[in-house]
């Protein structure tokens, strides 16, 4: 789950500009675009077919194993990062796992962490009926979508030049709740237990699967990772994705990216929060689309192929 900060007038959209042009601009139109939106969609539905992936359930364990198996296939190495939490709702310890996969990591010149949460919300807080609020959500968009993009993307980034190292990070416990103090748990754990070498920057995917996807600039990302955010959204324009990734601000979001920014990893949050099915029982594949997954995957695939030595300190 993510949260809007209404007190910061987050819903006042306005254009974002930086007054500079890229010194590293290439002919992005010629970059290979191999991301398969149909295969990404299959990953979304496979997760949903397992049921609600709430920590402590069989569906959660099956999803962990599904992601880990595919990560092992496509990465040089993969590992589980276990952690636990004494959950206020049950007063019992809940076991959770981050899942990490590395490509070209040790000897790379630039390292990026790509992350998404794989758990789903235990309670449909936004439902109107009190009885429905106690039920878990399926999380087709809020959970499965970001994971689906990354699982398909990692097939293609194996061929990225060795100068770029990639960590695929699937975080758990993002949406446990019900309060903020019991959310974003996997990202917090990862950030507190960083191993060397440290990522140079990060890109978070959250709620990127809805139909007619529009991902604006997230204000916390702009403040904390300005160079990365502007460079990525300029790249979206270069690859004809400006309608999906417009250079204008959206709502301010509390999300996993804040924990990474807190430990010095500039990280951008790619999220479309205008989703009426958020934290309801209607967060199902019916309201998502393969096309949206394809646009996000294409953005990242072309960015990674183009920007193999890019760092947040570079002028871009």
Model-derived regions: residue spans:
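Active-site-adjacent substrate-binding region
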Residues: 86, 201, 210-316
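Signal peptide processing junction and immediate N-terminal pro/mature segment
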Residues: 9-26
């Amino acid at each position: 789950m993510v949260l809007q900060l209404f007190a910061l007038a987050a819903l006042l959209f306005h254009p974002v500009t930086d007054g500079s042009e890229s010194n590293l601009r290439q002919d992005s139109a010629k970059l290979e675009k191999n991301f398969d939106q149909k295969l990404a969609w299959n990953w979304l539905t496979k997760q949903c077919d397992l049921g609600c992936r709430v920590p402590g359930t069989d569906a959660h364990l099956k999803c962990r194993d599904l992601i880990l198996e595919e990560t092992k296939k496509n990465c040089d190495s993969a590992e589980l990062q276990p952690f636990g939490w004494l959950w206020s709702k049950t007063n019992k310890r809940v076991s959770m796992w981050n899942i990490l996969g590395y490509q070209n990591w040790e000897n790379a010149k630039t390292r990026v962490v790509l992350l998404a949460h794989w758990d789903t919300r235990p309670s449909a807080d936004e439902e109107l009926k009190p009885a429905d609020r106690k039920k878990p959500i399926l999380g087709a968009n809020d959970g499965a979508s970001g994971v689906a993009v990354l699982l398909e993307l990692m097939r293609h980034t194996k061929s990225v030049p060795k100068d770029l190292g990639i960590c695929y990070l699937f975080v758990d416990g993002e949406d446990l709740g019900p309060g903020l103090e019991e959310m974003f748990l996997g990202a917090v754990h990862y950030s507190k237990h960083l191993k060397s070498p440290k990522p140079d920057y990060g890109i978070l995917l959250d709620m990127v699967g809805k139909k007619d996807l529009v991902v604006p600039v997230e204000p916390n990302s702009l403040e904390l990772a300005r160079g990365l955010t502007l460079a990525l959204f300029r790249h979206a324009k270069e690859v004809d994705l400006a309608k999906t990734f417009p250079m204008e601000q959206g709502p301010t979001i509390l999300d996993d990216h804040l924990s990474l920014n807190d430990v010095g990893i500039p990280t951008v949050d790619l999220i479309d929060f205008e989703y009426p099915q958020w934290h309801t029982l209607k967060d199902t594949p019916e309201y998502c689309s393969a096309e949206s997954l394809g646009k996000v995957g294409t953005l990242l695939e072309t960015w990674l192929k183009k920007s193999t030595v890019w760092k947040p300190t570079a002028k871009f």
